Amino acid sequence: MAVKIRLTRMGSKKKPFYRINVADSRSPRDGRFIETVGTYNPLVAENQVTLKEDRVLAWLANGAQPSDTVRNILSKEGVLKKFHDSKFSK
């Protein structure tokens, strides 16, 4: 089972916000998911992001692949740097 970390659209028409979910790559965008690991609100000025960093790092360590947008969000929040440092530190 290929697992992805991706965005699920919530909110009303013209006012979206997104949940950052871990889901099977074959399930639909707003369909079944395994776990919610954060939220993303693009409408506020500073693009509000909340993350459960420990869970995101655990899923990345288990092989979950982030989507392009989620990869950018995780990079801006510094989570990918922590993952890289923990993976390649000796």
Swiss-Prot record:
Domain of life: Bacteria
Gene3D superfamilies recorded: 3.30.1320.10
SUPFAM superfamilies reported in the protein's UniProt record: Ribosomal protein S16
Keywords: Ribonucleoprotein, Ribosomal protein
GO BP annotations, alphabetical order: translation
An example molecular function term from Gene Ontology annotations: structural constituent of ribosome
Record-level GO cellular component terms: cytoplasm; small ribosomal subunit
Family matches, as InterPro entries: Ribosomal_bS16 (IPR000307), Ribosomal_bS16_dom_sf (IPR023803)
Pfam families found in the cross-reference section: Ribosomal_S16
Membership in a protein family: Belongs to the bacterial ribosomal protein bS16 family.
Protein name: Small ribosomal subunit protein bS16
Lineage: Bacteria, Bacillati, Bacillota, Bacilli, Lactobacillales
